[in-house]
Amino acid sequence: GTWEQYEAAGEWLDKLAAGIGCEIHRVQMVPGNHDLDRDKLSVGGSKLLEYIREGGAAEYEEVIANENDRSTLFSRFEDYGRFSVGYNCGLDDEAKYATNLRIEVGPGRWIRFVRLNSALLCHGREREEPAELMIGARQFTIPRPVAGEEIVVLVHHPLHWYKDAQEVRQYVDSRVRVFISGHEHDPKVQVNKFDDNCDVMMLAAGAAVPFKSDDTYTYTYNIIEFDWDESSDSLSVAIHPRTWNPAKTSFEADNKRLGGSEPQFILGSPNFRKAGLAAVDSGPKPSADTPDHVPEHVEFVPTEDAEVDTEETATMPSDVEGYELALLRFFRDLFESDRLRILLALDAIPAESNERMNQGMERKLFDWLVREGRLPEIIEMTDRLIAERNEGEM
């Protein structure tokens, strides 16, 4: 996970977003075992990982509770951190779960994305059996959903890779509607009934680039649709798996994996029902092809955690037009020197300040400028600095 690779990833994501009609900043991401820079693992960091592997939950919390030890492990995610914060998917630097986005799928019916980092303990030789990775209580205490809201968890490693899988599973079964993981290269889906009116989908999404290609492991990707099933007041999940056909040298529908020929699932969703009857528009529903198509309703929401400082929560900017794209370009497309140049020019950094500058501090200052109404100036300076760099490269 080096910056040159993330630059290429950003270009690929921009092309992917354009191909499916998605805004380039409307991306959710979580880190995997290839997203950390293993060359940055120090001798001390190796000892910390070994200490946790040989121990358990108590040893994990002992290390993570220490700011210096935590920083040692997170230092390997420096480039990923800069990349992901541009997409508003930055890592929680206290190793907690991250959640700041929810999307309306029906009248008063929402899905909230919760992101987990399962790669913090990765070192390049991690094993599935016996499991040695951990999610940790700071992350697996997933927020209890509110009425009208179902939770979709995004994480890289499947459950059985964790030493604390049993504890994680308790929270998944009681609070999550869809659990999406990657890492393993053979896609699978399973729906478990928690009770008569409550389902939990475990979706192992597979990998676009497997370590080998044969009848079992091949190049795959999925298109997943989330919708509201009005008749049952439930979350509807339609999975459209795609697989590589080497004979045709193209991707095609995959009728063997992830639901086969009937990839639509209606999941019992008690949190939808808690919201009461939905106010349904009885008129004809516009299609995506009609001019009056209504865009999706997306909300940025603060992490719901009793331990979050109210002052910290207040740093979230209001829904300012252009904020998301400006955030992406500021962190992903500018050098660190350019970002500091903007912050200094706009008086975001006090002249007498000697506080250490990191991505978290840069993000706070960026959001402060937005709240002060200075987003247009950020955008103008970002455009100018990128243009100057491009001219210099010609």
Features from the language model and the residues they span:
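Binuclear metal-dependent hydrolase catalytic cores centered on His/Asp/Glu-rich metal-binding motifs
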Residues: 60-148
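Divalent metal-coordination and catalytic microenvironments
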Residues: 9, 32, 116, 153, ...
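Short, well-ordered amphipathic alpha-helices
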Residues: 9-17, 137-139, 224-226
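Core catalytic region of metal-dependent phosphoesterases/phosphodiesterases
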Residues: 1-68
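A short C-terminal boundary segment appended to hydrolase-like catalytic domains
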Residues: 226-372, 376-380
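Extended hydrophobic secondary-structure segments that form protein cores and membrane-embedded regions
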Residues: 1, 26-34, 114, 152-156, ...
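Conserved beta-sheet core of the metallophosphoesterase superfamily
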Residues: 159-237
